[in-house]
Amino acid sequence: MKFLKNLSASLVFAAGLSLGATNANAGCSAHLGDFDWDSANVHTAIASYVIEKGFGCDVQVSKGSTTPIMAAFFDGQIEVITELWEDNLVELLKPHFADGSILHRGVNTPASEQAFWVDRATAEAHGLKSVEDMKKPGIWELFKDPEDPSKGRMTSCISGWTCYTINYVKLKEYGLDEMYTNFDPGSGGALDAAIAGGFAKGKPVFSYYWTPTSLMGKPEIDMVRLEEPAYDAQCWQDMSVVVEDIKANGTEVYAPSCACEYKDMALTKTVRADWAAANPEVDAFIAAYSIPTETVNNLLAYYVDVSGGDMEATAMWYLENNTEWLDWVPSDVAANIRATL
């Protein structure tokens, strides 16, 4: 399996280092796009292992943030995405689904949520139940940003993730931008560390976050989801237009629109149509691939806390300890996989 660890914005793909011997089928290949968060890593790991070890295909994985990975997917350099936060990318995806160049391949995880969160102790002590409550006098000072002490800090997404720009627009629409910074922690690991560090030190935490994740499953992490205006499809559509404009042209093009809560959603998969036509058996596997949310949480705990971020070890642990994957592949492919475990 070939991994390009740090995908640059220029997306110049070079031959990666093979991480193990493979009996690659010259007529079967897949280039998977992976992202810089744990759940995407886990799904990419399992799919890659099955495609390489089970189907005998040549497999390459490129990892990066949302913007460069999706750009590479749209122009055909990447062929398979195993975890797509589709509702975050409405305007970006629309023309490619419409022209048939990319295809829906169903759900990979049935349930997820994204939101603004506050640690329970602070929320209960100060009656913080909604984003409107974050504007109460003196509240921002509980979360003072050390880099800008005139404001509180809302720890946000990574700037390369679409949700960073969504959160930027939300803070402005909710009138929170005058009180809080939309802080970019720099990496998914740093985002986790900021939240975990706040709990470890007994300090207030105000952050964007999502589930399923290993962090939210830890007993010491107790967060309250802040209420926002209810999800509305038209509102989200209007906001998405502004978000994509900002991503393309910078924050100076911001225009007032609308904001609402993230939609609790199933995470999905997508493939290039030309790749699907050339690799129908592997495409059928991608379409069948789906893991229950509870199992994903267990996988994430193993990936982060046991394997130390080892993608191949996590894939093997999943395949050794679960059986739903047997329904995704023909019996001969399953036998090939079992022979490697």
Predicted features along the sequence, with ranges:
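Short, well-ordered beta-strand elements
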Residues: 27-39, 57-62, 151-155, 286
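Short, polar/charged alpha-helical segment
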Residues: 39-57, 169-171
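N-terminal segment of the mature folded domain
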Residues: 65-120
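Ligand-binding pocket segment of bilobal, Venus flytrap-like solute-binding proteins
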Residues: 70-72, 78-82, 155-240
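A conserved helix-loop-strand patch within extracytoplasmic ligand-binding domains
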Residues: 101-156
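A bilobed periplasmic-binding-protein/Venus flytrap-type ligand-binding module shared by bacterial periplasmic
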Residues: 114-124, 266-278, 301-302
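C-terminal lobe and pocket-closing loops
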Residues: 219-290
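C-terminal functional modules
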Residues: 262, 275-276, 283-341
